[in-house]
């Protein structure tokens, strides 16, 4: 992994992309889907790490198109 990739990972991973579990489990996901705040140079994978599958399922109904 290059130095730049590591930098990107550090930038991307701590981003709070996923809403906290509690508001996420009922169909109370935040209406506006949080935009991917990662710089364009970041690899898509670390940036797109969202909720664990269990949480992501209910949340995805509110945020339909997250991958482009």
From Swiss-Prot:
Start and end residues of each stretch annotated as 3.5 X 9 AA approximate tandem repeats: 21-65
UniProt GO BP: epidermis development; keratinization; keratinocyte differentiation
Sequence repeat extents: 21-26, 27-35, 36-44, 45-53
Tissue specificity field: Not expressed in uterus.
Subcellular location: Cytoplasm
One GO CC term on file: cornified envelope
Family label: Belongs to the cornifin (SPRR) family.
Physiological role: Cross-linked envelope protein of keratinocytes. It is a keratinocyte protein that first appears in the cell cytosol, but ultimately becomes cross-linked to membrane proteins by transglutaminase. All that results in the formation of an insoluble envelope beneath the plasma membrane.
Protein name: Small proline-rich protein 2K
Lineage: Eukaryota, Metazoa, Chordata, Craniata, Vertebrata
């Amino acid at each position: 992994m290059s130095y730049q990739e590591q930098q990107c990972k550090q930038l991307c991973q701590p981003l709070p992309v996923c809403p906290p579990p509690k508001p996420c489990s009922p169909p109370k996901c935040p209406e506006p889907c949080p935009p991917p705040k990662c710089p364009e140079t970041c690899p898509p994978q670390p940036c797109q790490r969202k909720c664990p599958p269990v949480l992501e399922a209910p949340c995805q109904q509110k945020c339909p198109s997250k991958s482009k």
